[in-house]
Amino acid sequence: MNKRKVKNVLFIMCDQLRADYLSCFGHPALKTPNLDALAAKGVLFERAYVQSPVCGPSRMSYYTGRYVHSHGASWNFVPLKVGEMTIGDHLRPLGVQSAIVGKTHMRADLSGMARLGIDPNSKIGRRIGECGFDPYERDDGIHPYSGHDPEPAYNQYLRDQGFEGDNPWEEWANATVDDEGNIRSGWFLKYSNKAARIPDEHSETLRPSPMPVCSSRRMPCR
């Protein structure tokens, strides 16, 4: 491939987004105009299915193009074994630099690398630990348990934009406005340890749920 013809590709992967909760798929109340615009200008797949209800294995299927029972990463933090080719590995020989930004819930196959004599801190070892992608800005959002840098570069970027704090991601980017108009960070939001644990008084309502395009604090994007 001629490197001059290589184009940038931005692949956005949403976590826990149901297709039938998009107005372009016919939801009667929820309005998703920005996603609708993308669907209208592009290709809308009406019969596309994730390969696992668990997010990590499903991501590995996106990366490898294979079923969960084939790539073997059957749960969050189950390593994708050494030698498993991903889209990052396939694109690199074509002159494309591929990187992951955000979370992926994948851990390196340390035992596999040890068996093959690969240094986890080497260039190839770090790529294996990032699903075949180049290390960039990894943040699985579960500090300090993820084993990754608890002070990602994005936090310093937010401070440089004037969003001060010990953890600007939590205090500013991951913030919302409550019913009284007060700004609440993710630390104070309701924690539900099971999906859709909605209080009875809020379980049925005629008021459509808001789906903001960006943070109420007008977070800068990078």
Please report, for each region that a protein language model flagged, where it lies by residue.
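Formylglycine-dependent sulfatase
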Residues: 1-222
